[in-house]
Regions:
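Short, flexible helix-loop junctions that flank or precede catalytic/ligand sites
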Residues: 1-257
Protein backbone atom coordinates (compact mmCIF):
# COMPACT_ATOMS: atom_id res chain seq x y z
CA UNK A 1 0.00 0.00 0.00
CA UNK A 2 1.18 3.50 -0.85
CA UNK A 3 -0.62 6.29 1.00
CA UNK A 4 -0.86 10.02 0.32
CA UNK A 5 -1.93 12.18 3.25
CA UNK A 6 -2.98 15.79 3.64
CA UNK A 7 -6.01 18.02 4.14
CA UNK A 8 -8.70 18.62 1.53
CA UNK A 9 -7.32 20.67 -1.35
CA UNK A 10 -3.68 19.73 -0.82
CA UNK A 11 -3.26 18.07 -4.21
CA UNK A 12 -3.55 14.41 -3.18
CA UNK A 13 -5.71 13.43 -6.16
CA UNK A 14 -3.33 15.09 -8.62
CA UNK A 15 -0.41 13.20 -7.09
CA UNK A 16 -2.26 9.87 -7.27
CA UNK A 17 -3.36 10.43 -10.86
CA UNK A 18 0.21 11.34 -11.84
CA UNK A 19 1.43 8.13 -10.22
CA UNK A 20 -1.12 6.02 -12.09
CA UNK A 21 -0.28 7.65 -15.42
CA UNK A 22 3.40 6.99 -14.78
CA UNK A 23 2.91 3.24 -14.31
CA UNK A 24 0.04 2.79 -16.79
CA UNK A 25 0.71 0.50 -19.74
CA UNK A 26 -1.26 -1.90 -21.96
CA UNK A 27 -0.02 -4.76 -19.78
CA UNK A 28 -1.07 -3.16 -16.47
CA UNK A 29 -4.70 -3.41 -15.39
CA UNK A 30 -5.58 -0.41 -13.22
CA UNK A 31 -9.00 0.10 -11.60
CA UNK A 32 -9.97 2.99 -9.34
CA UNK A 33 -12.86 3.70 -6.98
CA UNK A 34 -13.34 7.41 -6.32
CA UNK A 35 -15.67 10.01 -4.84
CA UNK A 36 -15.89 11.78 -7.20
CA UNK A 37 -14.02 10.82 -10.38
CA UNK A 38 -12.25 14.13 -10.93
CA UNK A 39 -10.50 13.45 -14.26
CA UNK A 40 -10.97 10.83 -16.95
CA UNK A 41 -7.78 8.80 -17.36
CA UNK A 42 -7.22 6.99 -20.66
CA UNK A 43 -6.66 3.26 -20.32
CA UNK A 44 -7.78 3.16 -16.67
CA UNK A 45 -11.13 1.83 -15.40
CA UNK A 46 -12.67 4.34 -12.99
CA UNK A 47 -15.66 3.74 -10.70
CA UNK A 48 -17.69 6.47 -9.02
CA UNK A 49 -18.92 5.45 -5.56
CA UNK A 50 -22.62 5.96 -4.80
CA UNK A 51 -23.38 5.30 -1.10
CA UNK A 52 -27.14 5.85 -1.54
CA UNK A 53 -27.38 2.65 -3.58
CA UNK A 54 -24.85 0.78 -1.44
CA UNK A 55 -21.84 1.34 -3.69
CA UNK A 56 -19.36 2.43 -1.03
CA UNK A 57 -15.57 2.37 -1.21
CA UNK A 58 -15.57 -0.98 0.60
CA UNK A 59 -18.24 -2.53 -1.63
CA UNK A 60 -16.69 -1.29 -4.87
CA UNK A 61 -13.26 -2.50 -3.75
CA UNK A 62 -14.65 -6.00 -3.19
CA UNK A 63 -16.09 -5.93 -6.72
CA UNK A 64 -12.85 -4.61 -8.20
CA UNK A 65 -10.83 -7.49 -6.78
CA UNK A 66 -12.99 -9.99 -8.68
CA UNK A 67 -11.63 -8.48 -11.92
CA UNK A 68 -8.02 -9.38 -11.03
CA UNK A 69 -6.44 -5.91 -11.32
CA UNK A 70 -2.71 -5.26 -11.03
CA UNK A 71 -3.15 -1.84 -9.44
CA UNK A 72 -6.04 -0.45 -7.38
CA UNK A 73 -6.68 3.13 -6.33
CA UNK A 74 -9.07 3.70 -3.42
CA UNK A 75 -10.02 7.38 -3.29
CA UNK A 76 -9.93 7.54 0.49
CA UNK A 77 -9.69 5.13 3.41
CA UNK A 78 -12.45 6.42 5.69
CA UNK A 79 -13.48 3.45 7.82
CA UNK A 80 -12.53 0.05 9.15
CA UNK A 81 -14.15 -1.94 6.35
CA UNK A 82 -12.40 0.00 3.58
CA UNK A 83 -9.08 -0.22 5.43
CA UNK A 84 -9.45 -3.99 5.89
CA UNK A 85 -10.32 -4.51 2.22
CA UNK A 86 -7.36 -2.40 1.09
CA UNK A 87 -5.07 -4.42 3.35
CA UNK A 88 -6.42 -7.71 1.99
CA UNK A 89 -5.96 -6.46 -1.58
CA UNK A 90 -2.32 -5.69 -0.91
CA UNK A 91 -1.76 -9.04 0.80
CA UNK A 92 -3.00 -10.84 -2.32
CA UNK A 93 -0.44 -9.18 -4.56
CA UNK A 94 -2.13 -5.96 -5.67
CA UNK A 95 -0.46 -2.56 -5.58
CA UNK A 96 -2.87 -0.28 -3.71
CA UNK A 97 -2.86 3.52 -3.70
CA UNK A 98 -5.05 5.52 -1.33
CA UNK A 99 -5.33 8.66 0.81
CA UNK A 100 -5.75 9.47 4.50
CA UNK A 101 -6.26 12.63 6.53
CA UNK A 102 -3.29 13.00 8.89
CA UNK A 103 -1.02 15.87 9.92
CA UNK A 104 2.10 14.21 8.58
CA UNK A 105 3.36 10.99 7.03
CA UNK A 106 4.17 9.23 10.30
CA UNK A 107 0.59 9.61 11.54
CA UNK A 108 -0.75 7.26 8.86
CA UNK A 109 0.17 4.13 10.81
CA UNK A 110 -1.64 5.09 14.01
CA UNK A 111 -4.59 6.39 11.98
CA UNK A 112 -5.16 3.00 10.34
CA UNK A 113 -4.64 1.17 13.63
CA UNK A 114 -7.21 3.49 15.24
CA UNK A 115 -9.66 2.36 12.54
CA UNK A 116 -9.39 -1.14 13.97
CA UNK A 117 -6.83 -2.69 11.63
CA UNK A 118 -4.41 -5.07 13.34
CA UNK A 119 -1.00 -3.41 13.81
CA UNK A 120 0.89 -6.33 12.24
CA UNK A 121 -1.21 -5.97 9.07
CA UNK A 122 -0.54 -2.23 8.83
CA UNK A 123 3.17 -2.78 9.47
CA UNK A 124 3.48 -5.48 6.83
CA UNK A 125 1.54 -3.79 4.02
CA UNK A 126 2.23 -0.03 4.08
CA UNK A 127 5.33 0.49 1.94
CA UNK A 128 5.42 4.29 1.81
CA UNK A 129 3.49 7.35 2.95
CA UNK A 130 3.72 10.80 1.40
CA UNK A 131 2.31 13.86 3.14
CA UNK A 132 1.87 17.01 1.08
CA UNK A 133 0.68 20.60 1.14
CA UNK A 134 0.30 23.36 -1.45
CA UNK A 135 2.18 26.64 -1.04
CA UNK A 136 1.58 29.82 -2.99
CA UNK A 137 4.40 30.56 -5.44
CA UNK A 138 5.94 34.04 -5.39
CA UNK A 139 5.29 36.16 -8.47
CA UNK A 140 8.55 36.08 -10.48
CA UNK A 141 7.94 39.64 -11.73
CA UNK A 142 7.81 41.41 -8.38
CA UNK A 143 9.31 39.23 -5.65
CA UNK A 144 11.79 41.14 -3.54
CA UNK A 145 15.01 39.82 -2.01
CA UNK A 146 15.87 40.78 1.56
CA UNK A 147 18.20 39.78 4.37
CA UNK A 148 16.09 38.21 7.13
CA UNK A 149 16.39 39.14 10.77
CA UNK A 150 17.19 35.96 12.74
CA UNK A 151 14.70 37.02 15.40
CA UNK A 152 11.90 36.89 12.81
CA UNK A 153 12.51 33.25 11.88
CA UNK A 154 11.64 30.17 13.95
CA UNK A 155 14.23 28.01 15.63
CA UNK A 156 13.82 25.26 13.04
CA UNK A 157 15.06 27.48 10.19
CA UNK A 158 17.96 25.62 8.51
CA UNK A 159 20.70 28.22 8.97
CA UNK A 160 23.37 25.63 8.16
CA UNK A 161 22.01 25.43 4.59
CA UNK A 162 21.37 29.15 4.21
CA UNK A 163 24.40 30.02 2.08
CA UNK A 164 22.77 32.70 -0.09
CA UNK A 165 21.81 34.90 2.85
CA UNK A 166 18.65 36.10 1.09
CA UNK A 167 14.98 35.25 1.28
CA UNK A 168 12.19 36.66 -0.87
CA UNK A 169 8.88 38.32 -0.08
CA UNK A 170 5.84 39.43 -2.10
CA UNK A 171 5.34 43.04 -3.16
CA UNK A 172 2.55 42.96 -5.76
CA UNK A 173 2.41 44.11 -9.37
CA UNK A 174 0.12 44.11 -12.40
CA UNK A 175 1.16 40.61 -13.40
CA UNK A 176 -0.11 39.12 -10.13
CA UNK A 177 -2.87 41.73 -9.64
CA UNK A 178 -1.21 43.07 -6.55
CA UNK A 179 -1.25 39.77 -4.66
CA UNK A 180 2.47 39.04 -4.78
CA UNK A 181 1.89 35.38 -5.57
CA UNK A 182 1.19 33.54 -8.81
CA UNK A 183 0.22 29.86 -8.84
CA UNK A 184 0.95 27.14 -6.31
CA UNK A 185 3.46 24.35 -5.80
CA UNK A 186 3.70 21.25 -3.68
CA UNK A 187 5.85 20.50 -0.67
CA UNK A 188 6.33 16.88 0.26
CA UNK A 189 7.32 14.52 3.07
CA UNK A 190 8.06 10.99 1.90
CA UNK A 191 8.32 8.23 4.49
CA UNK A 192 9.72 4.90 3.29
CA UNK A 193 8.78 2.04 5.60
CA UNK A 194 12.00 0.57 6.99
CA UNK A 195 12.30 -2.52 9.18
CA UNK A 196 12.60 -0.27 12.24
CA UNK A 197 9.40 1.59 11.32
CA UNK A 198 7.56 -1.70 10.75
CA UNK A 199 8.58 -2.82 14.22
CA UNK A 200 7.44 0.46 15.78
CA UNK A 201 4.07 0.25 14.00
CA UNK A 202 3.68 -3.38 15.05
CA UNK A 203 4.27 -2.37 18.67
CA UNK A 204 1.73 0.48 18.44
CA UNK A 205 4.40 3.06 19.18
CA UNK A 206 3.59 6.76 18.86
CA UNK A 207 3.64 8.72 15.61
CA UNK A 208 6.43 10.81 17.10
CA UNK A 209 8.65 7.73 17.51
CA UNK A 210 7.85 6.63 13.95
CA UNK A 211 8.80 10.09 12.72
CA UNK A 212 12.13 10.05 14.55
CA UNK A 213 12.96 6.70 12.93
CA UNK A 214 12.03 8.08 9.51
CA UNK A 215 14.19 11.17 10.04
CA UNK A 216 17.09 8.94 11.01
CA UNK A 217 16.71 7.09 7.71
CA UNK A 218 16.81 10.36 5.72
CA UNK A 219 13.23 11.64 5.49
CA UNK A 220 12.77 15.36 4.80
CA UNK A 221 9.79 16.89 6.63
CA UNK A 222 7.15 19.14 5.09
CA UNK A 223 8.65 22.12 6.91
CA UNK A 224 12.17 21.26 5.72
CA UNK A 225 11.03 20.91 2.10
CA UNK A 226 9.18 24.21 2.34
CA UNK A 227 12.29 25.97 3.68
CA UNK A 228 14.32 24.62 0.75
CA UNK A 229 11.83 26.18 -1.66
CA UNK A 230 11.85 29.46 0.28
CA UNK A 231 15.65 29.63 0.10
CA UNK A 232 15.41 29.08 -3.66
CA UNK A 233 13.16 32.12 -3.91
CA UNK A 234 10.10 30.13 -4.92
CA UNK A 235 7.96 31.09 -1.91
CA UNK A 236 8.10 33.31 1.17
CA UNK A 237 8.92 32.58 4.80
CA UNK A 238 5.43 33.79 5.73
CA UNK A 239 3.89 31.20 3.42
CA UNK A 240 6.06 28.44 4.89
CA UNK A 241 4.92 29.31 8.41
CA UNK A 242 1.28 29.65 7.32
CA UNK A 243 1.03 26.23 5.72
CA UNK A 244 3.46 23.96 7.56
CA UNK A 245 3.77 23.14 11.24
CA UNK A 246 6.85 22.82 13.39
CA UNK A 247 7.78 19.41 14.75
CA UNK A 248 6.97 20.69 18.24
CA UNK A 249 3.41 21.63 17.23
CA UNK A 250 2.88 18.24 15.59
CA UNK A 251 4.22 16.45 18.68
CA UNK A 252 1.83 18.43 20.90
CA UNK A 253 -1.16 17.57 18.68
CA UNK A 254 -0.17 13.90 18.63
CA UNK A 255 0.09 13.76 22.42
CA UNK A 256 -3.33 15.40 22.81
CA UNK A 257 -5.04 13.10 20.30
Amino acid sequence: IILVTGPTGSGKTTTLYSSLLRINSPDTKIITTEDPVEYQLDGINQIQVHPKIGLTFAQSLRSILRHDPDVVLVGEIRDHETAENAIQASLTGHLVFSTLHTNDASGAFSRMIDMGVEPFLVASTVEAVMAQRLLRRLCPHCKEAYTPNPDDLPRDFPWESFSEGKLYRPTGCRECRGVGYSGRMGVYELLITTDEIRELAHERRSSWEVKQAALKSGMRTLRDDAWVKAMRGETSAEEVLRITKSDRAIETEASNA
